């Protein structure tokens, strides 16, 4: 009996020894990351207005930047807001796919496109904020990828709004013009953002912002027009459609987010106080995420409840619209790649 007890105690001792090794194993698996640095310690390309600390050191290993997902720095919230939102979109995608045949139902393809587009822009944005600090070329590469995601989401939203949310009166006015114009403006947004970022050393900060904001604003005005017309028509008729409320809120959330994207508040009022939490761009991320999730819920409901209406209205439009989506995505990706090559050549010349 005593021997058995001693064996059990010995096993407990060995287990205790193994438990003591866990912190060492974790430390070897997740090494201590270099501390963040001040704005004066990083090249100008990484600097953000009114953000004075929390920058990650450039020229580290890729592993370091992936591990900074779990480090406190001035991009942490920007990464996690869109990363978690991308996961939520995947969950919604799986949930919807249990009742919707995306492959065989052509009228479900625009819903598939907007879900794919939302996941794409959220994922690309998270990658840009996580990995862009490695080098100047990485900075441009990942933000150009982010802009491709923005273009894809713009067209995906335009298609879904046009297909599911539009009223017959507005459809009559924009039929045949809406989707090609939406595709062009989505590409123009990608080009404007990429060129503005590429030319930013020679442009004032405001001009760089204009290259991003003006094409995006034009695209949004067109893309959201079916929704705005529907909200207005509902208000005029005094209807009580709950889906219209969802559409109204996702417009409001987007406009609030756009304000924080354009205006560096509150960090401009409290320089250095919002370096880790409270930046305008973080607030922009939060509102855009809420906007996207509200939009998806509204379109999902429209897909179910308005099917007889949009089947008669659009006929076999879905296949052509999907082809235009692929074309827009390819053009945007090629544009981003071309501007990246220009950046690479410019950095090579500067290095010489």
Curated annotation (Swiss-Prot):
<protein>
    <recommendedName>
        <fullName>Membrane progestin receptor alpha</fullName>
    </recommendedName>
</protein>
<keyword id="KW-1003">Cell membrane</keyword>
<keyword id="KW-0217">Developmental protein</keyword>
<keyword id="KW-0812">Transmembrane</keyword>
<feature type="topological domain" description="Cytoplasmic">
    <location>
        <begin position="1"/>
        <end position="75"/>
    </location>
</feature>
<feature type="transmembrane region" description="Helical; Name=3">
    <location>
        <begin position="140"/>
        <end position="160"/>
    </location>
</feature>
<feature type="transmembrane region" description="Helical; Name=5">
    <location>
        <begin position="243"/>
        <end position="263"/>
    </location>
</feature>
<feature type="transmembrane region" description="Helical; Name=1">
    <location>
        <begin position="76"/>
        <end position="96"/>
    </location>
</feature>
<feature type="topological domain" description="Cytoplasmic">
    <location>
        <begin position="297"/>
        <end position="316"/>
    </location>
</feature>
<dbReference type="InterPro" id="IPR004254">
    <property type="entry name" value="AdipoR/HlyIII-related"/>
</dbReference>
<feature type="topological domain" description="Extracellular">
    <location>
        <begin position="264"/>
        <end position="275"/>
    </location>
</feature>
<feature type="topological domain" description="Extracellular">
    <location>
        <begin position="338"/>
        <end position="352"/>
    </location>
</feature>
<feature type="topological domain" description="Cytoplasmic">
    <location>
        <begin position="197"/>
        <end position="242"/>
    </location>
</feature>
<feature type="transmembrane region" description="Helical; Name=7">
    <location>
        <begin position="317"/>
        <end position="337"/>
    </location>
</feature>
<comment type="function">
    <text>Steroid membrane receptor. Binds progesterone, progestin and 17-hydroxyprogesterone in vitro. Capable of mediating progestin-induced oocyte maturation.</text>
</comment>
<dbReference type="GO" id="GO:0048477">
    <property type="term" value="P:oogenesis"/>
</dbReference>
<keyword id="KW-0754">Steroid-binding</keyword>
<feature type="transmembrane region" description="Helical; Name=2">
    <location>
        <begin position="111"/>
        <end position="131"/>
    </location>
</feature>
<feature type="transmembrane region" description="Helical; Name=6">
    <location>
        <begin position="276"/>
        <end position="296"/>
    </location>
</feature>
<keyword id="KW-0472">Membrane</keyword>
<comment type="similarity">
    <text>Belongs to the ADIPOR family.</text>
</comment>
<feature type="topological domain" description="Extracellular">
    <location>
        <begin position="97"/>
        <end position="110"/>
    </location>
</feature>
<dbReference type="GO" id="GO:0005496">
    <property type="term" value="F:steroid binding"/>
</dbReference>
<keyword id="KW-0896">Oogenesis</keyword>
<keyword id="KW-0446">Lipid-binding</keyword>
<feature type="transmembrane region" description="Helical; Name=4">
    <location>
        <begin position="176"/>
        <end position="196"/>
    </location>
</feature>
<dbReference type="GO" id="GO:0003707">
    <property type="term" value="F:nuclear steroid receptor activity"/>
</dbReference>
<keyword id="KW-1133">Transmembrane helix</keyword>
<dbReference type="GO" id="GO:0005886">
    <property type="term" value="C:plasma membrane"/>
</dbReference>
<feature type="topological domain" description="Extracellular">
    <location>
        <begin position="161"/>
        <end position="175"/>
    </location>
</feature>
<dbReference type="Pfam" id="PF03006">
    <property type="entry name" value="HlyIII"/>
</dbReference>
<feature type="topological domain" description="Cytoplasmic">
    <location>
        <begin position="132"/>
        <end position="139"/>
    </location>
</feature>
<keyword id="KW-0221">Differentiation</keyword>
<keyword id="KW-0675">Receptor</keyword>
């Amino acid at each position: 009996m005593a021997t058995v007890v001693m064996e059990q105690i010995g096993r407990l001792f060995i287990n205790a020894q193994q438990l003591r090794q866990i912190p060492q194993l974790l430390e070897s698996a997740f090494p201590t990351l270099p501390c963040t640095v001040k704005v004066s310690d990083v090249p100008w390309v990484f600097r953000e207005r009114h953000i004075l600390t929390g920058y990650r050191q450039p020229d580290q290993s890729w592993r370091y930047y992936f591990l900074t997902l779990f480090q406190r720095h001035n991009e942490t919230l920007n990464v996690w807001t869109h990363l978690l939102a991308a996961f939520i979109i995947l969950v919604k995608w799986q949930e919807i796919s249990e009742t919707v045949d995306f492959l065989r139902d052509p009228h479900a393809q625009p819903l598939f496109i907007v879900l794919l587009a939302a996941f794409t822009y959220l994922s690309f944005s998270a990658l840009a904020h996580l990995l862009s600090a490695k080098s100047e070329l990485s900075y441009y590469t990942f933000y150009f990828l982010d802009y491709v995601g923005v273009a894809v989401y713009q067209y995906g939203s335009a298609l879904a709004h046009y297909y599911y949310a539009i009223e017959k009166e507005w459809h009559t006015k924009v039929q045949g013009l809406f989707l090609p114009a939406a595709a062009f403006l989505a590409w123009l947004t990608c080009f404007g953002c990429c060129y503005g970022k590429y030319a930013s050393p020679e442009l004032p900060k405001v001009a760089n912002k204009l290259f991003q904001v003006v094409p995006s604003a034009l695209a949004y005005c067109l893309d959201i027009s079916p929704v705005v017309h529907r909200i207005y028509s509902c208000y005029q008729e005094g209807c009580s459609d709950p889906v219209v409320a969802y559409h109204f809120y996702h417009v409001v959330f987007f406009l609030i987010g756009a304000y924080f994207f354009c205006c560096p508040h509150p960090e401009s009022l409290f320089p250095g106080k919002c370096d880790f939490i409270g930046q305008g761009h973080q607030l922009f991320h939060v509102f855009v995420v809420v906007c996207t999730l509200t939009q998806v819920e509204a379109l999902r409901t429209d897909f179910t409840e308005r099917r007889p209406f949009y089947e008669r209205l659009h006929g076999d439009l879905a296949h052509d619209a999907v082809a235009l989506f692929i074309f827009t995505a390819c053009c945007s990706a090629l544009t981003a790649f071309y501007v990246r090559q220009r950046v690479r050549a410019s950095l090579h010349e500067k290095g010489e």
